[in-house]
Amino acid sequence: MKKTVTSWSFPHCDLKESVGLSKLLSINAIDIGYFYKSAIDKKTLLKDYSRIINDLQKFDIEYSNLYHLFGDTLGDRNLANKDSLDENSKDIETASKFCKELGIRSIFVLPGIINKNQSRKDAFIN
């Protein structure tokens, strides 16, 4: 069985610290994402992901998953909104290339569950 941990499991740790804790726990794979202190920079990933790859290759750990969010917030680019299709398609293509080059075999997609001017509570109810 393969064990992995999410970098955001340690929200106050940077990525180097998260990797260190993961290895201390004998977990040799870590998920990466765009939130908390361990975050990779999404704008950089979408613009020039080779810089992020160079930074990540410094750590002796496998990256098992990219936690990807469309847009900048949960309400920014909902997948159900066809007006976001072109931007979302471009972003997922770039994120996929990044993952392929780094050897990440899966992308966890957070699709944007909230529409503009809608609260999380309203989204859950409706």
Question: Could you tell me what each predicted segment is?
Answer:
Residues 2-7, 30-32, 63-68, 107-109:
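Hydrophobic faces of well-ordered beta-strands that scaffold small-molecule active sites
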Residues 6-7, 40-41, 83-84, 123:
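A generic structural signal for short
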Residues 7-13:
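Short polar catalytic/cofactor-binding loops
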Residues 10, 43-44, 87:
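Residues that cap or flank secondary-structure elements
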Residues 15-36, 102-103:
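Catalytic domains of carbohydrate-active enzymes, especially glycoside hydrolases
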Residues 17, 55-59, 74-126:
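Active-site acidic/histidine proton-transfer and metal-coordination neighborhood
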Residues 31-57, 111-118:
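Glycine-rich, proline-tolerant flexible connector loops at the mouths of alpha/beta enzymes
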Residues 48-70, 125-126:
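Alpha-helix-loop-beta-strand connector modules within alpha/beta enzyme cores
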